[in-house]
Amino acid sequence: VERLVEKGGPSRYVSNYAVAGVSAFSTRLLDLLEKYGTMEQTIEKMIEEKMTVTAVVWEKEWAEFTWPWDILKANRLVVDNLLKGKGSFIAESADVHNSAVLEGPVYIGKDVVVRPGATLRGPVYIGNNVYVGNNALIRDYASLCDGVHIGYAVEVRNSMIFDKVNVGRMTYIADSIVGANSCIEAGAQMWNWRPGKKPLFIDDDGEKVQIPFRKFGAMIGDNVVLGVNSSIYPARRIGEGSSIAPGCVIDQDIPPYSEVSVKQVLEIRPISEETDQCE
């Protein structure tokens, strides 16, 4: 290795190779790292001091994690490698009702329960100890990690739902990421596109970054409570530990450990006792 260059746009393209993140160095690295602060600067200094720095070429597929949507790209890579050309896998301990519909390749882990009327339209990954309720639709690269609970008539599409998430009935999750131990209550909706095919952006320290997909939903951290009938605009982030009250419409990013509610004013007017309310 002659030098390292921080990645940038096409104008800074200098090599066909990228650092994939796995390294092995002598303990000398620790002394230099304490002095120079970053791994990149430290390796550059080792090269300047004529220390031997070599690279091993990884010739298989790999996934880079820079932006939240990279999780969905990596999920597709993993699911494809797990299922494509191999057919479906269903663990012996899984309880899949005979009226459930399985289409395309699906992976179903240990002690999974799939209730009557549910549809799994692959490619789909279902981890261990997952419950999929009646009439749920899990499709198109949806991945449910261990211990996830999916309620009645929930739809999940192209999303990554991490361990022990509880999703209430009639919720819609598409092109989204839901962190572990979160509770998505009944009727929550995660919008994933803007009308007119308008591009989607996220804010990165004050700079707008365009998302490279027309559809992208919510990014929800660990231990979040998303209240009944709440809705999230496309490409919005909810930080870990936050609590969203029922009925909120989330049109901006929510910082970690925030409590969000909506102000409501009830108007109560008298009506005649003779009024037939069902007419």
Regions found by a protein language model. Name each.
Residues 5-8, 78, 98-100, 118, ...:
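Short, well-ordered turn and helix-capping elements at secondary-structure junctions
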Residues 78-100:
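Long, charged amphipathic helices and adjacent flexible linkers at domain junctions
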